[in-house]
Every structure is written in C-alpha cells, then in structure tokens.
Amino acid sequence: MANKKSKGEESWGKLIRDIVVILLLVLGIHSCVAKPFYIPSDSMMPTLRNGDRLIVSKYPYGWSYASVSFHLAPKTEGRLFGKLPERGDIVVLEHPDTRIDYIKRVIGLPGDTIALRSGALFINGKPVKRRVEPALTIPADPNLPGPDSSLFRFVTRDASGREVLELPIVRETLPGGATFDTIDMGPGYATDDYGPVKVPAGHLFLMGDNRDGSADSRVSAERKGLGGPVPFDAIAGRAEIISFSTDGTTEWY
C-alpha cells in the first residue's frame, strides 16, 4: 500500500511540475516572443475593427515591464535591447496610470513637435500629406458600431437595403513614408485642434486612426486618454498580423 501511495504521489507531483513548466513556457512566449490581442473598440478603424484578433510581437523594440503578459511585472524604468518604433507603427501599450492595454499608431518620436489644426496633422511645423479618398463601405456585422459609438451616424443602407457603414476616409503619409487611412468625421471635435507639443526624450506620441473617436495622446487621462506623450517603457509590442478579422480578411502590418 505504501508503494502504491508513493507512486500516486509521484504521479501527482509530476503532473503538477508539468503544468508549472507549461505555464512558464506560455508566459515566456507571451512575454518575450508574441501574444494574441483582441481589438476592443473602434478607435483604430478603418485599419483595425472592433473584434479583430491580432498577433503582437514582443521583441522589435526590446523588452520592458510592459512586455510581461498579464501585467505581472511591477512598473520599472528602462528597456532591454531597446529600439525606438518607426512613425506609423501600430503598437500595444500599457496605459501609464491604469495599466489597461491600448492599441494606437506611433505619430511622433522623441524631439518631434506635434500639432493639429482643424483636424490636419503637423509634425515639426510641416503639414502631413493628406488626401481625401472615396468613402469606405463596410457591410454590417455583429460588431457594427452601436448608438454609443461616434461612428453610428455613418450607418446606412445600400441599394439592396443591406445595412452598411460608409466611412469618410483621409489617407495620410507621415515623414519617412508610412501611409495609412484615417477616419475624419469633419469639424467640431475637441481633438481637431491640439498643441503644439514637443515629445520629450524617451516618449512617443500616439494616435488612433479613427481621429475623432480615439482616446489617445491628445486626450487627458481623466477622459480615459493617454494624457500626452507616452513613456517608451510602456510599449508592450508591435501589431504584426490580423489572425482573424470580422470582415474575413487577414493582413500584415
């Protein structure tokens, strides 16, 4: 009986050790290599839609406390093998105060001066190239913006009576060549005029592609924004691929 009990205890001990090893491996991969990420809002439309699933790589910018999954690491200063993002990169970050995960686009690097005038973006005193594009029509799906969304007024029906979203698109090209589409809902939004603000050393200026519906570096922390330029240490990783999209597509970034 004693031998049987001993073997049973050995079996349980091995199982527990195996589980611990697996959990540590998963944590290590999530923290150092890549992890999945779910888009929870419309702030990065039209590039990313509410409900999209992403793969976020952890190594392009080095590692900091924000790289560790599940917010297990205490906030510290410094970054191992740190490399600054490029303008136009889409990054996942921890909010500097709440540690909630956000996803935004890098607009300004350390030393840049950022301003907006009537919705037009200026970097270092020069207007960013922008071009109005034809409206983007997106078929309705379960993640279609609801009445509480700033995009709800663009919900309409096409010729066949199908419910769609018709979005006003402006294509921007940042210094360095990164080109992407943004949503410009017209005048009258508080974030249409901002700055100028100089990005401090060790910080980044981040914005959502849904320019009039994004709580980003232009928006105070009290209004759930980022409250200005964000410390580089708060960046957790770079968005690489949509593993599943609500519109059925998969794209690289």
Positions of PLM-derived features:
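Hydrophobic membrane-insertion alpha-helices, especially the h-region
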Residues: 14-32
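Soluble "head" domains of membrane/secretory-pathway proteins
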Residues: 2-13, 32-33, 37-38, 43-253
